[in-house]
Design a protein with these regions (language model features):
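Glycine-rich, low-complexity intrinsically disordered segments
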Residues: 1-210
Length: 210
């Protein structure tokens, strides 16, 4: 009886909208995530797994459409203009072996040669891919399941903050990155954005994504 009562821990719904025995679905948790990088630092870059280990804070993508307005008699009509992805902030611990600092330095050097004062011929020479994965909490002998994956494509580091220092503080030294990217898609079984599918519109069935 006590176990059955757990199904009541949710919003009341009609029986034709939700199963009477289904309670609240388990939400994803903020601390169960993994950030990985592909191509950051270029051919001279070390193993980017060290970056993944040292991430302390991150974020998922933020998508925004530019609101456009058509003024008409006595009113206005709104429609979605071009979209934009907001930069993602990644905070990492700065390890004593210098792996994190070196990789970030190599990536910034790819974007602009600070010694020769020379820039890359094209953006494709320095852009990389970043993945934001939500995990289910598994570890060790129980491999984690990936609940959601965001692939951020065409990334570059817009801003690098090497962090403050203070004699009175015991906290670890961090490096904060602001990463700009061209596009983002969701992958995996729970993906909804950027995948191939069909959608019913007033004009009929259309294929999306792919």
């Amino acid at each position: 009886m006590a176990i059955a009562a757990l199904s009541n821990f949710t919003v009341p719904l009609a029986s034709d909208q939700s199963s009477a025995t289904q309670g609240l679905l388990m939400p994803k948790l903020q601390y169960r995530f993994r950030i990985s990088f592909e191509g950051l630092g270029g051919s001279k870059g070390q193993n980017t797994v060290e970056l993944t280990k040292q991430v302390t804070e991150a974020a998922r993508p933020t998508l925004e459409y530019e609101d456009q307005t058509i003024d008409i008699y006595n009113s206005r009509i709104h429609y979605a203009g071009k979209y934009k992805w907001s930069p993602i902030t990644i905070k990492l611990r700065d390890d004593v072996n210098g792996y994190v600092s070196k990789l970030i330095g190599l990536q910034n050097q790819r974007q602009f040669d600070f010694y020769e004062q020379s820039s890359a011929a094209s953006a494709g020479e320095y852009k990389f891919t970043m993945r934001v994965e939500m995990l289910d909490g598994g570890n060790g002998a129980h491999s984690p399941n990936v609940l959601e994956t965001w692939e951020c494509l065409g990334c570059y580091i817009q801003k690098t903050t090497y962090g403050s220092l203070a004699y009175k503080n015991n906290e670890v030294v961090t490096i904060e990155l602001s990463i700009v990217f061209d596009n983002a898609v969701q992958t995996g079984t729970t993906a909804g954005l950027g995948i191939q599918g069909t959608d019913q519109t007033r004009g009929g069935t259309k294929t999306t994504g792919g």
